[in-house]
Amino acid sequence: MKFSALLPVFFLLLAVIDYCQAFAFLAAIPSILSALGKRDVKTQKYVDIKRRDLDLDDMLSKLFED
């Protein structure tokens, strides 16, 4: 597919996105999607604890291997 064939699709997509910005719930979709991928303080705390527990379990298993 040629790049020149995709150009009208790109402009149509821009027009649709611009039109959707008028609706509050559609305008919130990009921010919601970006927030899904971010770590917040609450979840990061549990990730760190889990990682420390795995490191501790690994260390204890190496100590008691003998």
Swiss-Prot record:
The keyword Signal applies. Expressed by the venom gland. The modification Leucine amide is found at L36. Residues 1-22 form the signal peptide. Keywords: Amidation, Antimicrobial, Cleavage on pair of basic residues, Secreted, Signal. It comes from the Eukaryota. GO terms for cellular component: extracellular region. It is found in: Secreted. Its main location: secreted. Residues 37-66 form a propeptide. The keyword Signal applies. Belongs to the non-disulfide-bridged peptide (NDBP) superfamily. Short antimicrobial peptide (group 4) family. Probable antimicrobial peptide. Has no inhibitory activity against herpes simplex virus type 1 (HSV-1). This is Antimicrobial peptide Eval967. It comes from Euscorpiops validus (Scorpion). The lineage of its organism: Eukaryota, Metazoa, Ecdysozoa, Arthropoda, Chelicerata.
